Amino acid sequence: MNRTNKLILGAVVLGSTLLAGCSSNAKIDQLSSDVQTLSAKVDQLSNDVNAMRSDVQAAKDDAARANQRLDNKVFRICK
């Protein structure tokens, strides 16, 4: 190979390497963005679960009070 062909081949190899590096950086940036998005979704789901816990506890308390009222009525009827 003459000198010109070697320079062209070297430039092509260097260019390909640089493009591959840019592609990897773009993929890393995309993955980083995806991780941030997923982290935000996990935080939102965690907040939703915590909000539901208080709702579930309130429902349990209401059910317990209703059961107690029913038990009291049954006890009075059976007397």
Curated annotation (Swiss-Prot):
Residue positions bearing lipid (N-palmitoyl cysteine): 22
One biological process term in Gene Ontology: periplasmic space organization
Sequence-type repeats, residues: 25-35, 39-49
Key word Acyltransferase present: no
Membrane topology, from the record: Lipid-anchor; Peptidoglycan-anchor
Disulfide cysteine pairs (residue numbers): none
Induction behaviour: This gene is probably poorly expressed.
Superkingdom in the source lineage: Bacteria
A GO-annotated cellular component: extracellular region
Subcellular localization(s) per the UniProt record: Cell outer membrane; Secreted, Cell wall
Family classification: Belongs to the Lpp family.
Protein name: Major outer membrane lipoprotein Lpp 2
Native species: Salmonella typhi
